[in-house]
């Protein structure tokens, strides 16, 4: 089997902790597709604490015959982005991406060239991030064999001529169980466990520890599928923050998400957060 990219190691556990929640936000996502195959994604978010509203628009066109994908992005910070990707054309398993952003307000520009190559037992990635000070090179590699996974990730800053990121990861993955551990820059240690208990129930545990301050972070989360249209999620961490979420598919293409974050140490003090999300797809 093809192993996941380094960024996707431990993703199943992270999804149980992150998906189905949107504390302190009112969010609307709309996805549509034109007759010519152009995909439009519009997103709007309002922060209930600050009152700040953010919006974004993305258009994507896939030219399947040539393995090309064109993406245009815009957000309310007035940042424009263009991405061109070509996959499985030069070589099978190879994806090349050219990504640029431009902010007319500040005149700031950025550019990235990304290369990803995946085959049986191996997943490689190399990104070059162009900056005025000098390019930064991000590299990653994951190898997998019979469920075992090992990965390495680095960033080399050419302006400083040194490694600014140096991460290792080891994991084990089966159909319904995943174990993942990683060490970041030799100082941050983390681990996660994901288990699909049944067709309806998924659980996850994560643990993180940073050397030097002896602070250990711990969390446990679960997701239960009530039926084909509804699911509930819950999570708690060692800071006594309790999160609950409810996701309901009202009808095909319409999904509602309700979530709440409760501070277990200060239940009567207020400061709890609510979230509302609506996804429309046509």
Curated annotation (Swiss-Prot):
The record marks 72 as: Involved in hexokinase binding. It catalyses: chloride(in) = chloride(out); K(+)(in) = K(+)(out); a 1,2-diacyl-sn-glycero-3-phospho-L-serine(in) = a 1,2-diacyl-sn-glycero-3-phospho-L-serine(out); a 1,2-diacyl-sn-glycero-3-phosphocholine(in) = a 1,2-diacyl-sn-glycero-3-phosphocholine(out). Its main location: mitochondrion. Expressed in skeletal muscle and oocytes. The chain crosses the membrane at residues 25-34, 38-46, 53-63, 68-75, 79-88, 94-103, 110-119, 122-129, 136-144, 149-157, 162-174, 177-184, 188-197, 201-210, 217-226, 230-237, 241-250, 253-262, 272-281. The keyword Membrane applies. InterPro entries: Porin_dom_sf, Porin_Euk, Porin_Euk/Tom40. NAD(+) binds at residues 241-243, 259-263. It comes from the Eukaryota. It is found in: Mitochondrion outer membrane; Membrane. Pfam families: Porin_3 (PF01459). GO terms for molecular function: nucleotide binding; porin activity; voltage-gated monoatomic anion channel activity; voltage-gated monoatomic ion channel activity. The modification N-acetylalanine is found at residue 1. GO terms for biological process: monoatomic anion transport. Consists mainly of a membrane-spanning beta-barrel formed by 19 beta-strands. Non-selective voltage-gated ion channel that mediates the transport of anions and cations through the mitochondrion outer membrane and plasma membrane. The channel adopts an open conformation at zero mV and a closed conformation at both positive and negative potentials. There are two populations of channels; the main that functions in a lower open-state conductance with lower ion selectivity, that switch, in a voltage-dependent manner, from the open to a low-conducting 'closed' state and the other that has a normal ion selectivity in the typical high conductance, 'open' state. Belongs to the eukaryotic mitochondrial porin family. This is Non-selective voltage-gated ion channel VDAC2. It comes from Xenopus laevis (African clawed frog). The gene is vdac2.
């Amino acid at each position: 089997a093809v192993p996941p990219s380094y960024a996707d190691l431990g993703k199943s556990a992270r999804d149980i902790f992150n998906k189905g929640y949107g504390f302190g936000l009112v969010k609307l996502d709309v996805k549509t597709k034109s007759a010519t195959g152009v995909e439009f994604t519009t997103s709007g978010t309002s922060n209930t604490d600050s009152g700040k509203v953010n919006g974004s628009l993305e258009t994507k066109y896939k030219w399947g015959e040539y393995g090309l994908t064109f993406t245009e992005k815009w957000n309310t910070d007035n940042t424009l982005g263009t991405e061109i990707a070509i996959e499985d054309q030069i070589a099978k398993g190879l994806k090349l991406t050219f990504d640029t952003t431009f902010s007319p307000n500040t005149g700031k520009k950025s550019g990235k060239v990304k290369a990803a190559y995946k085959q049986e037992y191996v997943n490689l990635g190399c990104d070059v991030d162009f900056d005025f000070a000098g390019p930064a090179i991000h590299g990653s590699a994951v190898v997998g064999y019979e469920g075992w996974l090992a990965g390495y990730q680095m960033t080399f800053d050419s302006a400083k001529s040194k490694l600014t990121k140096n991460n290792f990861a080891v994991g084990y993955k089966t159909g319904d169980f995943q174990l993942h551990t990683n060490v970041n820059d030799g100082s941050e240690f983390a681990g996660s466990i994901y288990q699909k208990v049944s067709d309806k129930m998924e659980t996850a545990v994560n643990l993180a520890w940073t050397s030097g301050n002896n602070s250990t972070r711990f969390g446990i989360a679960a997701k239960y599928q009530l039926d084909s249209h509804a699911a509930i999620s819950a999570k708690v961490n060692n800071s006594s923050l309790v999160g609950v979420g409810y996701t309901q598919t009202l009808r095909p293409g319409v999904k509602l998400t309700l979530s709440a974050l409760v501070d277990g140490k200060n239940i009567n003090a207020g400061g709890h957060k609510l979230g509302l999300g609506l996804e429309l797809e046509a």
